[in-house]
């Protein structure tokens, strides 16, 4: 997808989310989630899940596009894919590998899995934006996606924290996450080593964003619709 098409898609998503925010956060008597006279708007669990699913799917699409763009421009003929298997910094976190495994996990545990993975990406996404600028002839398509993903990952994390507070009010969160130590690899002088570090990070981001997207859709079905979907 070219930059113009991506920009149009991003703009449409932001308009959708903005409209959702306006509709949900005005104290209008016709909206049951905001009773008449309420000082603070309380967004329903269903609406929180709707937003989270939209965001997670958007992030996964951007991650896939960014990985494909990087692979096409920098990784052809270098054999990176064979070295990238099972070398993600989040591999230390126990996560279900497929839908069948995820269905066996209690929703509270699955919510915590999502929080841990999202928190584990805060630091690498911040540095990814900075280091991508130093790539030789780095295309705007990669940089713009990196910036967008970092911002939307923060929004999704905030949304997930609100969901957890509604599903389990009063429960104190355990802020567990996997520490990323890959910054020196993104700054290596050897070009092949540096490009592989970028490739591996983007490969892992695509993998984890797909997992989160799948887990969220499963949780929405289970919690909001009582598995009747």
From Swiss-Prot:
Phosphoserine PTM sites in chain numbering: 56, 64, 120
Cystine bridges: 34-41, 88-204, 221-229
Keyword S-adenosyl-L-methionine recorded: no
InterPro entries found in the cross-reference section: 4_helix_cytokine-like_core, Somatotropin/Prolactin, Somatotropin_CS
GO cellular component: extracellular space
Pfam families named among the record's database cross-references: Hormone_1
Homology family: Belongs to the somatotropin/prolactin family.
Annotated function: Prolactin acts primarily on the mammary gland by promoting lactation.
Protein's recorded name: Prolactin
Gene: PRL
């Amino acid at each position: 997808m070219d930059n113009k098409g991506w920009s149009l898609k991003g703009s449409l998503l932001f308009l959708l989310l903005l409209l959702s925010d306006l509709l949900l956060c005005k104290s209008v008597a016709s909206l049951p989630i905001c009773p008449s006279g309420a000082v603070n708007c309380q967004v329903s669990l269903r609406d929180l899940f709707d937003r989270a699913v939209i965001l997670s799917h958007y992030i996964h699409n951007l991650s896939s596009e960014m990985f494909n763009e990087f692979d096409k421009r920098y990784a052809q003929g270098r054999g990176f894919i064979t070295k990238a298997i099972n070398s993600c910094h989040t591999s230390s976190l126990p996560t279900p590998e497929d839908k069948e495994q995820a269905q066996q996990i209690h929703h509270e545990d699955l919510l915590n899995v999502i929080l841990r993975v999202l928190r584990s990406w805060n630091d690498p996404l911040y540095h990814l934006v900075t280091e991508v600028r130093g790539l030789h002839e780095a295309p705007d398509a990669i940089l713009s996606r990196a910036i967008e993903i970092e911002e939307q990952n923060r929004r999704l994390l905030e949304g997930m924290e609100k969901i957890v507070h509604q599903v389990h009010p009063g429960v104190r969160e355990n802020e567990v996450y996997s520490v990323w130590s890959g910054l020196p690899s993104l700054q290596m002088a050897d070009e092949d080593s540096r490009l592989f570090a970028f490739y591996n990070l983007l490969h892992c981001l695509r993998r984890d964003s797909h997992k989160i997207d799948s887990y969220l859709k499963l949780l929405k079905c289970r919690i909001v619709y009582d598995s009747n979907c």
